[in-house]
């Protein structure tokens, strides 16, 4: 039975992480286009990101990616802790998205601190690790050639 949530219709046993895939496209009544990407770091049901590393990578990418692309709406973690969703507005160039993600991950490796990792700006400020986030980014970058190979 087809479900309302796109990712619930994805056969998670047939994908091969890491990958970047278009998860959804929506056209607004005024013609705006919203594209949601599934940016998968870990193999579903086999591995996951630990929460401090995921949380820190969320902060780093959410801040840094906007230096490379003004059409980014959101970068948010998946509850299963295997990846993130990247949502963009009025932009439909998959190759450019891969390039932006690559530049962003390279910048994550150069970061000296996790942005907004304090009690004033974050709801769980004690739950961060720059080293963990950089390890995730490095592992993702190491498999750059595989990002477009989803496996489904």
Swiss-Prot record:
Its cofactor is Fe cation. GO terms for molecular function: iron ion binding; S-ribosylhomocysteine lyase activity. Pfam families: LuxS. Keywords: Autoinducer synthesis, Iron, Lyase, Metal-binding, Quorum sensing. Signal peptide: none annotated. Binds 1 Fe cation per subunit. GO terms for biological process: quorum sensing. It catalyses: S-(5-deoxy-D-ribos-5-yl)-L-homocysteine = (S)-4,5-dihydroxypentane-2,3-dione + L-homocysteine. Its EC number is 4.4.1.21. Fe cation binds at residues 55, 59, 122. Belongs to the LuxS family. Involved in the synthesis of autoinducer 2 (AI-2) which is secreted by bacteria and is used to communicate both the cell density and the metabolic potential of the environment. The regulation of gene expression in response to changes in cell density is called quorum sensing. Catalyzes the transformation of S-ribosylhomocysteine (RHC) to homocysteine (HC) and 4,5-dihydroxy-2,3-pentadione (DPD). Homodimer. This is S-ribosylhomocysteine lyase. It comes from Helicobacter pylori (strain J99 / ATCC 700824). The lineage of its organism: Bacteria, Pseudomonadati, Campylobacterota, Epsilonproteobacteria, Campylobacterales.
């Amino acid at each position: 039975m087809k479900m309302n949530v796109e990712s619930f219709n994805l056969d998670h046993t047939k994908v091969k992480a890491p990958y970047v895939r278009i998860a959804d496209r929506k056209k607004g009544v005024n013609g705006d286009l919203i594209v949601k990407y599934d940016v998968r770091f870990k193999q579903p049901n086999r591995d996951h990101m630990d929460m401090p590393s995921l949380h820190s990578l969320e902060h780093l990418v959410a801040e840094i990616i906007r230096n490379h692309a003004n059409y980014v709406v959101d970068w948010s973690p998946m509850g299963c802790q295997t990846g993130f969703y990247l949502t963009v507005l009025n932009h439909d160039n998959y190759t450019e998205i891969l390039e932006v993600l690559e530049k962003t991950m390279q910048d994550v490796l150069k970061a000296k601190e996790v942005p907004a990792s304090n009690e004033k700006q974050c709801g769980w400020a004690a739950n961060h690790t720059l080293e963990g986030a950089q390890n995730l980014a490095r592992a993702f970058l190491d498999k750059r050639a595989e990002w477009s190979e989803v496996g489904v």
